[in-house]
Structure formats: C-alpha cells, structure tokens
Amino acid sequence: MTDILKKIELYKREEIAAAKATVSLADLKAMQAGQSAPRGFHKALIAKRDAGRFGLIAEIKKASPSKGLIRPDFDPPSLASAYEAGGAACLSVLTDTPSFQGAPEFLTAARSACTLPALRKDFMFETYQVHEARAWGADCILLIMASLSDDEAERLQDEAFALGMDVLVEVHDAEEMERALKLSSPLIGINNRNLRTFEVSLTVSEALAPMVSADRLLVGESGIFTHADCKRLQAVDINTFLVGESLMRKEDVAAATRALLFGEAAIAAE
C-alpha cells in the first residue's frame, strides 16, 4: 500500500468509527428501506456494449488531491442531468470529503436527478460503508485492490451483492489484476494513474487488458480525455470508461459528454 493510501486509510477508519457512534447499522438499514431498488449498474454498462456503443461512467467530482478544485460552480443534480442528456450510462459520485471535497448528499442528490445507476466513489474498508452506500442510494461500490487484502475485498463484495448492488474492482498492476480475478464481480476497472507518482498512461490498460477473459467487463479509468483515447482502448477490448475531470472542466457538460462518446465530427454532423 502506498503512503497516500495509508494516510487515507487512517482517516477513513476514524471517520467510520465516528459514523458508527452516530448512525447505527439498524439506522442505515431503515434508510435503505426508504431508497428505490438498485438500478443495475453492471446491467446498464452491458446494455451499451451490446448496442455497440461506448459505456460511460461519468464522474461528479468537485476536487482532487493532485489538481485541487476542479469545478467551482458545482451542482450535482445539474451535472447528473447533463451527463444523462449527453449519453452516459452510469454516474460515479465522490463521497470522500478530506481528499475530494465529496459528500454523501452529493450522491443522493445526483441520483435523484436522473435515471442513471450511481457508484459510491470512496475508499472502502468496512462492511458498514457498504450499508452507508445503499442507504444513500448507491447502486455500486468501488473496491481498490491496492488498499485491501483478498479477504477484505471478498467480504465487501459479498456484502454489496447481498444488498443487490454491483461492485467495481479497481487495479493498477498485474499482481492486483490476478487478485481481482479471484473475486466473482464481473466489473474490473484498470486505473491508468500510478497512486505512487500520480503519473497517468493508457499503456497501463493496454498491458493489463489481455489478462482478462470475455466474461468480465473492463473499465478504463483516468487519462481518458478524448474520443480518440476511447478508440485507442477499444483496440484492447475496453469499451467502457470512467471519466471525470476532463468533463467536469467543460462549460457545457452534456456536449462534452457527447463529444467524448461519439467524436467531435459526429456531433458537428448532427
């Protein structure tokens, strides 16, 4: 685990302890009962693939540790609506506050503003957080293999499955990929960002994609800015992408989403 992830785990475990003291598991389960059923995150991405289209997980992210504030005029419901209008298949919403200025209410508000399934984008360590995610309306959780043991990852995955949610398993290298493939989740995300150096390269996805059989759905994460980037990864059978910063910085988010998915030329021809 990197020093960055170790620091994150320290504050996350403090957050979890504080949350448990305020909101019990029974409270979370009561909140879950008031949520609409999971919308089918994996199913939505498969539908795009089967239709011969790129599947986009569009991210709602106010800030990041490496880039600082990304979008000053930050309104999750408006962004969710714009992403849906632009053709996104799913949402990813940051709920981590210290590093990304995220919040649970951003997830709930964004999901309520559209019909898209939503991922709780956060650092998951305990099953309590899985119950939080469902209570807030999430349809999917993220597991970062670099920060979890095999047993921890499986426990979190199984808890999510029990709640009807999907699980996106994130890897960055071959060793993490081998571990991820031991899990049953069909959603595998390849993060092109090195969490040690923050360098980003699409060659990470290109190197790891051949390790994965066709029964899994690969998601390219980080470093995807243009339709050409999507086409490049399509060459290694990656047709689904998680994109945040490059879209969040655009004034017209819906138009930027369409351009990413279909290309500037296709948009101009409309």
UniProtKB/Swiss-Prot annotation:
BP GO annotations: L-tryptophan biosynthetic process
Pathway involvement of the protein, from the record: Amino-acid biosynthesis; L-tryptophan biosynthesis; L-tryptophan from chorismate: step 4/5
Keyword vocabulary terms for this entry: Amino-acid biosynthesis, Aromatic amino acid biosynthesis, Decarboxylase, Lyase, Tryptophan biosynthesis
Pfam families to which the protein is assigned, alphabetical: IGPS
MF term (GO), any: indole-3-glycerol-phosphate synthase activity
Catalytic activity line of the entry: 1-(2-carboxyphenylamino)-1-deoxy-D-ribulose 5-phosphate + H(+) = (1S,2R)-1-C-(indol-3-yl)glycerol 3-phosphate + CO2 + H2O
EC number(s) recorded for this UniProt protein: 4.1.1.48
EC primary class: lyase
Membership in a protein family: Belongs to the TrpC family.
NCBIfam families listed in its UniProt record: PRK00278.1-2 (NF001370), PRK00278.1-6 (NF001373), PRK00278.2-4 (NF001377)
Classification via PANTHER family: INDOLE-3-GLYCEROL-PHOSPHATE SYNTHASE (PTHR22854:SF2), TRYPTOPHAN BIOSYNTHESIS PROTEIN (PTHR22854)
Protein's UniProt name: Indole-3-glycerol phosphate synthase
